[in-house]
Amino acid sequence: MELIPAIDLLEGNCVRLVQGNYNKVTKFNSDPVSQALRWEDMGASRLHIVDLDAARQGFSSNDDVIKQIAKSLSIPIQIGGGIRTSKRAKELLDYGIDRVIIGTAALEDPRLVEDLASAFPKKIVLGIDAKEGKVATRGWIEQSDVRTEDLIKQFSNAKIAAIISTDISTDGTLEGPNLKSLTSVAKVSNAPVIASGGIGSLADLISLTTLEKAGVTGVIVGRALYDNKFSLEEAIKVLLNIDLQDQPFNAKNIA
């Protein structure tokens, strides 16, 4: 299972929100580029970025920072937040971003996801943020009546790279992932599922690996890393050991 550290951008800073509440902001680093490099140096195989300004207002004020991060890192980067047009998606890919995450637009303009996935196979990720099983949009400010599973089924034939399933009620709380919700998502998804929200301990990561065979192949971690609940190296090691235990014996796995 791949562990993906997160950087949330707000007004040029690296921050974290609690349950998507813009009034509950903790600033962790005023230099997101150095933070991104730190995660890479500590062993991250991919970086997850959320442009909170763009998610809330529909346009970005963080492009200079995003470009600098893309230029500075050698690992692939995925980014979400306010990507609601093909122009914006292409712009980010041109910056050197590996995958773009479509959230609000997936609900409001499903054709956009299908067209982008066809034009850029395996470069488009479906980001579904939900609370109590219903999809939220526009930076989690608006709540829809659409069930998560129903939205996923709409894109069963689209060439998307993955689905990021974020449980808003657990995001930033460190109270553990919503395994029930993730199980439901994995059951209806044809694409790999990446879990997001609630990770607060190494035990939470271990519990999440029970869903790997069901299709949950990655996990995004933010606050737990910033609050030093565990280190990135520790988390990667734990997940690697579990992966090795699940494999048949192979002498090459022994360092």
Curated annotation (Swiss-Prot):
CDD domains: HisA. Its EC number is 5.3.1.16. Its main location: cytoplasm. Pfam families: His_biosynth. One of its GO terms (cellular component) is cytoplasm. Pathway: Amino-acid biosynthesis; L-histidine biosynthesis; L-histidine from 5-phospho-alpha-D-ribose 1-diphosphate: step 4/9. GO terms for molecular function: 1-(5-phosphoribosyl)-5-[(5-phosphoribosylamino)methylideneamino]imidazole-4-carboxamide isomerase activity. It comes from the Bacteria. The keyword Transferase does not apply. It catalyses: 1-(5-phospho-beta-D-ribosyl)-5-[(5-phospho-beta-D-ribosylamino)methylideneamino]imidazole-4-carboxamide = 5-[(5-phospho-1-deoxy-D-ribulos-1-ylimino)methylamino]-1-(5-phospho-beta-D-ribosyl)imidazole-4-carboxamide. The keyword Isomerase applies. Keywords: Amino-acid biosynthesis, Cytoplasm, Histidine biosynthesis, Isomerase. It is found in: Cytoplasm. The active site is at 8 (proton acceptor), 129 (proton donor). SUPFAM superfamilies: Ribulose-phoshate binding barrel. GO terms for biological process: L-histidine biosynthetic process; L-tryptophan biosynthetic process. Belongs to the HisA/HisF family. PANTHER family: 1-(5-PHOSPHORIBOSYL)-5-[(5-PHOSPHORIBOSYLAMINO)METHYLIDENEAMINO] IMIDAZOLE-4-CARBOXAMIDE ISOMERASE. HAMAP family: HisA. This is 1-(5-phosphoribosyl)-5-[(5-phosphoribosylamino)methylideneamino] imidazole-4-carboxamide isomerase.
